[in-house]
Amino acid sequence: LQEMFKRARQSRLIPYDPAELLSLPTVTKGRRRSITEEERTAILRISQHHRAGLWILTLLYTGMRPGETAALTWADVDFEHNEIHVHAAKESGSRTIKGPKTASGVRDIPIHAALLPRLLESRGKPFSLVFPTKAGTVQNESSMRRMWNSFIREMEEESGPVADDLTPYCLRHTFCTDLQRAGVSINVAKELMGHADIQTTANIYTHKDSETLHKSIALLDGSGGKPGGNVKVG
């Protein structure tokens, strides 16, 4: 609209540009978050038997992007050195496998002790996909969404309503905050997350969720870290 008025003014079709003083509204991007302890408990429980359980645990314990898990083969799961080698990802909007956008996307992630037995249990042929579709093809956005939605439905059946903002990327975010809580340096976290810019890692390291804030204030008011706790006065 602004461009249209600008051209009309330049062509002297209108005496002035009515859009010149307009300001565009600020758009606030949705903020990814870590999972709550209640969500973690439910996720770990359902992962024990759900068909997408290994995929969910891999997202949670490696911080990999969903597109990176789609490209993962058993040759990338290095049981000898207890590492997962990340060097490829599914191209957005297709099933094509490509290299990472930046060199930082290539990385080795140690296998979490809780993830190792599940990987060993599902171990396949070296160059077969770790998370194929039922047809044996590379996952795309639609198939991964179906896996996620199926998992969420079971969470709701067992634990009640699930927050609308709980997405696979919340598990990646949680991996990073778990590193921060464990005292892992931000530089190491950047490497494990595959971030090209350390500021991206810093934004997660410095972002405190509501649960963390309530726990910290509990040291002062004796509320136990829960909203609505008893506040000591005086």
Tell what function each PLM region has.
Residues Q10-L72, E80, E91, S104-G105:
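Basic, Lys/Arg- and aromatic-enriched nucleic-acid-binding interface segment
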Residues T26, S34, K90, L116, ...:
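Catalytic-site neighborhood detector that most strongly recognizes the C-terminal catalytic loop/helix
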Residues R9-D17, F79-H81, L120-F127, E157-E158, ...:
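Proline-centered turn/helix-capping motifs that create local helix->coil transitions or kinks
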Residues H81, S92-V106, A113-L115, T133-A135, ...:
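C-terminal secondary-structure termini that scaffold catalytic or DNA-interacting sites
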Residues T41-A52, T62, I109, G124-V130, ...:
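Short, basic (Lys/Arg/His-rich) helix/loop patches that form interaction surfaces
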Residues Q2, A70, T177, K190, ...:
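Key DNA-contacting residues within the recognition helix of helix-turn-helix
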Residues L1-A8, I111, W148:
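Non-catalytic DNA-binding core/recognition domains of DNA-processing enzymes
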Residues S34, E83, V106-P110, A202:
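Well-ordered beta-strand positions in beta-sheet-rich domains
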